[in-house]
Amino acid sequence: MATSGRLSFTVRSLLDLPEQDAQHLPRREPEPRAPQPDPCAAWLDSERGHYPSSDESSLETSPPDSSQRPSARPASPGSDAEKRKKRRVLFSKAQTLELERRFRQQRYLSAPEREQLASLLRLTPTQVKIWFQNHRYKLKRARAPGAAESPDLAASAELHAAPGLLRRVVVPVLVRDGQPCGGGGGGEVGTAAAQEKCGAPPAAACPLPGYPAFGPGSALGLFPAYQHLASPALVSWNW
């Protein structure tokens, strides 16, 4: 084995092979490595196969022309709630009394009458129309069998059912010589009928229910300033 001043532990020195200069050795260029596929890029390529790109999707799913089909705007929930919730109109006491008075006179109003009443009460014709519709419905429901009537609706129903019961009319009676004049030759017959009906002398007026009966001379007794006038029963009528 050839010894040298420098110990070498290479394979050639151990096998006693001649050393070759490193400059004369053929250089081996590194073989180009094939680029390894990036897993992220492979995943993106696979996803693109399932889903179209932005350009392709814009072509495929492009909406139709606005001129051919009107675009429907989604209604917001707030606007729907505002439409459902209508503001309740509060009528004043004077307006309510006038509406009730007119309802007792006339349940159905024509368009000119509604406009006239609305301008009088400073309301709109629609408000007057709705008030009359609601009041007719309440009155109809109150008249249904087994329904509890409110005082206002009951009074309104009584006014329409029997208007003559709430009005009393006093008919004047002409008296001649202490006897009522019935006109024509039937004075005695009328006097007898009045006595049988009223059970009082003909000079006394028939008392009405709820009113006290006054005699022939007691009418002027209520007014002391007119007591000097003669009693109506003593005045003789010249026919």
From Swiss-Prot:
It is found in: Nucleus. GO terms for cellular component: chromatin; nucleus. Pfam families: Homeodomain (PF00046). Its main location: nucleus. Residues 1-11 have a biased composition (Polar residues). Residues 84-143 bind DNA. SMART domains: HOX (SM00389). Residues 62-79 have a biased composition (Low complexity). Residues 21-32 have a biased composition (Basic and acidic residues). Belongs to the NK-2 homeobox family. PANTHER family: HOMEOBOX PROTEIN NKX, HOMEOBOX PROTEIN NKX-2.8. This is Homeobox protein Nkx-2.8. It comes from Homo sapiens.
